[in-house]
Amino acid sequence: MSISSKDFQNVTSAGFADDTFAADTFAADKKSPFESSVFENKTQVLPVDSVSRLSNGARSRSNSNISLSEPHALNDTVEDQPVSKWVWVLAFAAGIGGLLFGYDTGVISGALVVIGTSLGGHELTNGGKEFITSATSLGALLGGIIAGALADFFGRKPVIAIASIIIIVGSIVQVTAHHLWHMIVGRFVIGWGVGIASLIIPLYLSEIAPSKIRGRLVIIYVLLITAGQVIAYGIDTAFEHVHNGWRWMVGLAMVPAAFQLFILIWLPESPRLLVKKERSQEAYNTLARIYPTAHPYEIKTKLYLIQEGVRDPFSGSRWQKIVKTFKELYFNPSNFRALILACGLQAMQQLSGFNSLMYFSSTIFEVVGFNNPTATGLIIAATNFVFTIVAFGVIDFFGRRILLLLTVWGMIAALIVCAVAFHFLPKDENGNYTSGQSNAWAIVVLISMIVYVASYASGLGNLPWQQSELFPMSVRGLGTGMSTAVNWAGNLGIGASFLTLMSEITPTGTFALYGGLCFLGWLGALFCYPDLTDYTIEEIGELLKHGFGVRESMRHLKRVRQERAWSREDKEQNN
């Protein structure tokens, strides 16, 4: 389907009188069932209120480089419409992959404490624990690299199904493990599934979400990650004293994976991917469900804008297209800045050390002297869950940038306090900690970790997963694949080095190191991270064309809030 900008501009320049607006719709080059019903050359009559939304909404769009005569200028009309509750149900259904992600990262913490001699007849060493945790990260790294290409080739829904199947297989391998390397293979396999899911689900949600709630929809995915971690710690606690209970811990990951496979039947495909695959009728139907009160013209306008955004700029063989896609990502300034932002945020998230706490919190609290380290770890997971809900409520109010810059300082302060507390914990002549949970410094360690996790969950735990919004459709699969690979590479490094760092440079040095890395990340965000709140995916590319757009994004956010305040005042006066 091909529609010229000239045809579109004829619509925007049409006049209107009294209560109606006459608009010539677009004539399609190809005749399809969709085009004959949506873009057939007919005259439509739109109510004045629809026209008002089209013109006023377009003129109020804050990007000063976009005029009413351009297609992008009309995008705001449908985005201003009420969103169907179906979108929220869809987000929770798709986000079950996040629950799997969280369950897998959380459950291993308790399992490592109780595996005992089940793997080969001898106790796990620190090296064995690091191998088990890092195998998942290595599998996820490789899965994340290929997930983007799989998503572009097969579609978003089939790849979610592939991830669920791989997780089920990995769970079975772990349950049947009787040797260390058998367990490592199972962790590696499940890592593939988790890595694929960690890319495809935020990508899917960002493509289907209206711009005004895109941040919150992606946070639902992160919220379900944290819910999975809470469930994992609860399962760990329940099976801690059961013979071979760790097999139940790792095996129960099959349940949500199987459930997600089942509900995929009712999930729609991404409208942007449907348009790219020339399945425009399905895309129209999906958008109509997302915006149930929107006028058909507004949905057609949205479809036109999506079509312009997903138009394949590359020609040639598949290999030539792959090469051109790499060049477009790395040599197009806008796309390369998007890649820097996405990879930088993912690296910042992992190098903050959070996942070392998820993987080894039970081990840490056992070292500190808590009598029930797994139950204590549940407090950490619950904190993560609660403050992810807080982030859900405030991300689109405060904006992404302010939220990130403020919460990272909470992480830094908590890590410094934790480092100091470890320094003052009593030790024996061999350097082993001898305090119990009644020791004041042990309590300080716990409180500082709670503050650290609360700060992380409110900002850095969520924002990197908004990465899909940074990339245009032409490089989205590759760009999100690269940034997700950075996430899992950092995760691999953290998981493989944490216990070694605790031994070699002491817990004080380890947590101080994480605090220093957080500060470096904060500096990078201060100078390079724009606030993308209320930008459509198509507009973000324009913002990044000539720089990182930090100042322009802040002006944009200020204008949007001012416009919303005026809109509320107008409604109050009209009432």
From Swiss-Prot:
| UniProtKB keywords | Glycoprotein, Golgi apparatus, Membrane, Transmembrane, Transmembrane helix, Transport, Vacuole
Please indicate the ranges of residues that lie on the Lumenal side.
108-129, 178-186, 237-246, 371-376, 422-441, 508-510
* Compartments where located: Golgi apparatus membrane; Vacuole membrane
Domain of life (superkingdom): Eukaryota
Name the membrane topology term: Multi-pass membrane protein
Tell me where the transmembrane regions lie: 87-107, 130-150, 157-177, 187-207, 216-236, 247-267, 350-370, 377-397, 401-421, 442-462, 487-507, 511-531
The protein's matches in PROSITE patterns, at most eight in alphabetical order, are given as:
MFS, SUGAR_TRANSPORT_1
* Cytoplasmic topology ranges: 1-86, 151-156, 208-215, 268-349, 398-400, 463-486, 532-575
Q: Where does this protein come from, organism-wise?
A: Schizosaccharomyces pombe (strain 972 / ATCC 24843)
Q: Mind telling me which SUPFAM superfamilies this protein's record contains?
A: MFS general substrate transporter
Put simply, this protein is called: Myo-inositol transporter 1
Please report which protein family the annotation says this sequence is part of: Belongs to the major facilitator superfamily. Sugar transporter (TC 2.A.1.1) family.
Enumerate the Gene Ontology biological process terms.
myo-inositol import across plasma membrane
The positions flagged as glycosylation sites are 432
Biological function = Transporter for myo-inositol.
One example GO MF annotation = myo-inositol:proton symporter activity
* Any GO CC annotation of this UniProt entry: membrane
